[in-house]
Amino acid sequence: MLDISNTTWDLSNQSVLQPLWDYLQQNHESSLRSPLFPVILSVSMYLVLVFFYTVLDLLAPTWPSIRRYQIHQDRTVTWSNIGSTLALTTYNHLLYIFPAAVAQWLWRPPIPLPREAPTLTAFLLGIVGCTVVFDFQYYLWHLLHHRVGWLYRTFHALHHQYRQTFSLVTQYLSAWELFSVGFWTTVDPLLLQCHCLTAWAFMLFNIWVSTEDHCGYDFPWAMHRLVPFGLWGGALRHDAHHQLPGTNFAPFFAHWDWLGGTATMPAPVKTKKRDDKEA
């Protein structure tokens, strides 16, 4: 006899992500278990995003439909800007990221994969939870490295060589800052006991919103326009931080800067255009 109550219970607890997870395990298990996989995933995501935004930067001077969304419409991203930021990014990856990845590949055993996928609720809450924790960690790190002069000069001043943000500035970082960001991105899902699928999704989300913060554009689909009540900082607020380095320290959310008295509200792009005409 069919036990309808147990069948209903099993279906209700089966994750909608299970088919995807089953496919990934059946077809790409060896790749997913490799210690190199998170590194390749994150680097690939970053390169795709910066390629997209860099193409926009190069087209913007002659394409008004793109330029209208630039935060600083009177400035252009030059080949020199692209070359210098890309050179440091390449240097950091070759000198630090690649050797660390190879070391993990040599000495760390393959990662065991759970049979079951996370529930959709656990998946989404895990990403949100990791983002909240990372936001707090980097807010404190960022505030400290601006308030202590030696820390700023030694580790963080490099990132502020560019007052105009564009995508490649995202990882225009010292080795210490790059290590700090990578450490929290890796450890936070472990602290919250997230499924590995959730951890990888958080990693991709973190790279996406970090690059968006530095992209130099105020698009209608930007995170700060999607998250209600002004809770998300976004590209405008982070650009304001590069203009006024004593403000807007939190990387993603806005509440820590509100509570800490370090928040500043940038003018929207359209207001800037109108002000320029009036001037």
Swiss-Prot record:
Q: Which domain of life is it from?
A: Eukaryota
Q: How does it sit in the membrane?
A: Multi-pass membrane protein
Instruction: Give GO cellular component annotations, separated by semicolons.
Output: endoplasmic reticulum membrane
Instruction: Locate the transmembrane regions by residue number.
Output: 36-56, 86-106, 120-140, 165-185, 189-209
What's the cofactor? Fe cation
What is the enzyme's class at the highest EC level? Answer: oxidoreductase
Residue ranges of the Fatty acid hydroxylase domain? 128-262
The glycosylation sites annotated in the UniProt record are 6, 13
Give the PANTHER family listed for this entry: STEROL DESATURASE
Q: What is this protein called?
A: Cholesterol 25-hydroxylase-like protein 2
Source organism per UniProt: Danio rerio
